[in-house]
Amino acid sequence: MENPITMTISSQPPKIKYLTNKDLLREIHLSKNTYCSFISPDYSEYDLILPNISKINVRTIAEAKRNQAIRLSKRAHESAVLTGGKKLPAKEFEVDYKTIKKVDVVFRIMTFEHIPLAPGRKKTLKNTADSHDKVNFPPFQHWKFDDNNNLIPVGKSHWKGDLTTGEFNKEHGKMTNNLARMFLKLCERYATRGNVRGYTYNDEMRGQAILQLTQIGLQFDESKSDNPFAYYTAAVTNSFVRIINIEKRNQNIRDDILEMNGMNPSWTRQNSGVSNFSAGTGASSGEGGGDWD
């Protein structure tokens, strides 16, 4: 008797992801760390963002413990899935936040205390940032409890060297290569949208968007939102619209000069005149009717 023929159905190919907020947040975090100084690399990760030290209390400590437990659980689950090559229930890797010690929690405090003052930088001071030296992203400090239950600083942004003997520095860091690639991919993908891909100056719009992202890419504030994709998409949209408006204004000036010299303007100007006439009278389009007052 012949052996039966067995057929194996291959699983569906993995879904190709475009950009996720999780990946963007990770690269933003790594990029900002290059501008920071920490007592230990372990303190570069934070569990909770607060506006000032006075907000650290029993409630915020418990919230920070929960956040750290969630992060450790996800990290253990992802590592097990990569190692085993198969899906595993996430509940098996859950970490109880009550097992996390108080001294293991790190707080990110948004503050300008370590940023030098810059009197005269702006005439009218609207916020705290206007009275300090300009930096490329909101400054912060990392704090934690020591064994004596005292809060101590363990990290500073825009800082080089030791936390006590070091100095302010905002030029020694850089953006990660992965974040730069994400910006390029975001602009490339946006440039293929139906409402912008037909423009002859599509490359100029992409270039302006990339330039804008390199300038404001790290200004995303994690304490206000966890959706950097929307933040960057809005910046890219504004850059594209800006170039479109500039090109339209230049085209209008060129058409005005051509008409002043008795020459035919661009087809866009001519077609806009026909459409305006049609909208005003309804005669050219064949729709509607009525007399032209």
Region locations from a protein language model:
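Short, glycine/acidic-rich hinge or "gate" loops at secondary-structure transitions
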Residues: 3, 204-205, 225-229, 249-258
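Short, charged low-complexity intrinsically disordered segments located at boundaries
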Residues: 214-222, 241, 246, 262-273
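Short alpha-helix-to-loop micro-motif enriched in aromatics/charged/Gly
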Residues: 193-201, 213-235, 246-248
